[in-house]
Design a protein with these regions (language model features):
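Helical (often loop-to-helix) elements that flank the catalytic cores of nucleotide-handling enzymes
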Residues: 53-74, 95-122, 142-173
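Charge-rich interaction segments
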Residues: 173-179
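Short, glycine/acidic-rich hinge or "gate" loops at secondary-structure transitions
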Residues: 83-87, 123-128
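Flexible loop/turn segments at secondary-structure boundaries
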Residues: 89-90, 143
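Signature for HUH/AEP ssDNA processing cores
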Residues: 1-87, 94-110
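A glycine-rich phosphate-binding loop feature that marks nucleotide/adenosyl-phosphate handling sites
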Residues: 126-139
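Single conserved hydrophobic/aromatic residue that forms the stacking wall/gate
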Residues: 180-185
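Alpha-helix initiation and N-capping motif
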Residues: 4, 65, 130-133, 162
Length: 185
């Protein structure tokens, strides 16, 4: 892991955006959903502030964190890992075992559905995208002229069991019958 961290730091110091994949892949070189083998977390992307072209609902980090806290309390989810990206937050609930993507999809879609139902304003394209890449803590978000540090904001709870998340998220929905792919306002 130390070697990966040093490499990420080097790329970031040289002006590159640095990301990591959330899934494992069957074959190297293809970051397509069809090439994803397993997933080991549920996650959200919540934007705030002025860097998003007026498409966000939260003005400040504090407002976004407050909405996330309310959502977790209402659903009964544990405190997630939270990474501050300099213009949003990425949240992670690690799972106690890897899931094949077809096992993971219903949980991810149900999490997305609950966010919408409970008015937690997320980037809905992210939550159920098994080929998604997100920012690496310890690097910099360099999308704008202002370099913003990507950092671990809160270390969440230990990995949760898949059974726990199935219970808390409720009956999984069929991803093929649901089209929730655009951000809602």
């Amino acid at each position: 892991m130390e070697e990966v961290s040093v490499t990420a730091d080097d790329f970031s110091a040289n002006g590159y955006e640095v990301y990591f994949a959330l899934g494992t892949f069957i074959e190297a070189g293809s970051r397509e959903q069809t090439n994803v083998e397993q997933m080991r977390s549920l996650y959200l992307d919540i934007d705030y502030g002025p860097h998003h072209g007026g498409l966000v609902q939260y003005e400040t980090l504090e407002e976004a964190l407050g909405a996330l806290k309310t959502f977790c309390k209402d659903i009964g989810l544990p405190k997630p890992y939270i990474v501050s990206t300099g213009g949003g937050i990425h949240t992670y609930w690690p799972l106690d075992k890897p899931l094949d993507k077809e096992e993971w999809y219903p949980l991810a879609y149900q999490l997305k559905n609950l966010c919408i139902e409970h008015h937690l304003y997320i980037d809905t394209k992210v939550t159920a995208d098994c080929a998604r890449i997100l920012r690496v803590p310890g690097t910099y978000n360099q999308k704008t002229d202002e370099k913003r540090e990507v950092k671990l904001f809160y270390a969440g709870t230990a990995p949760g069991s898949v059974e726990f998340f199935k219970e808390k998220l409720g009956e999984p929905i069929d991803r093929k019958s649901t089209r929730l792919n655009s951000s809602h306002t």
